[in-house]
Design a protein with these regions (language model features):
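Non-catalytic cap/lid and distal C-terminal segments of serine-dependent acyl enzymes
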Residues: 1-131
Length: 131
């Protein structure tokens, strides 16, 4: 089962779409599940959402291998260069930023993104799912 969430990222002051795959019996099973967090999550499950028209096949792999796992697919930021800002732990120098044909420096929000993962997303998952 896939649960669709929209989460406000406090450390970045913006929203993000998240798909959470849980095993069908997760509510009735008396066990905990490991969690795999997937960045660029729009590519994780469905061909029609993937930027190349073919998903990364996480659902097929989990089902084929009969893995008991919760998959958390966080969509990237689709605003121009915001993906690079969020995944980049430091601001890139002017020469590198020029490769993106921009008049501003790129990157530098990586720590805020990791803060979201560790202080907001993981506690949310721990509260709402058997992790």
């Amino acid at each position: 089962m896939i649960i669709k969430e929209e989460m406000y990222i406090r450390s970045l002051k913006r929203k993000r779409h998240i798909d959470i795959y849980v095993p069908d019996d997760y509510q009735s099973a008396k066990k905990r599940y490991p969690v795999l967090i997937i960045n660029d999550g729009q590519n994780a499950f469905f061909d029609e959402q993937s930027y190349i028209g073919k998903s990364w096949g996480f659902l097929e792999s989990v089902r084929e291998l009969k893995l008991d796992v919760i998959l958390v697919a966080i969509y990237c930021n689709f605003e121009p260069l915001k993906r690079e800002d969020e995944y980049g732990p430091w601001v890139m120098n002017q020469e590198f930023s020029r490769e993106y044909d921009t008049h501003r420096l790129v990157g530098g929000e990586g720590n805020a993104y990791v803060t979201f993962l560790t202080t907001q997303l993981q506690p949310y998952l721990d509260q709402n799912f058997p992790t």
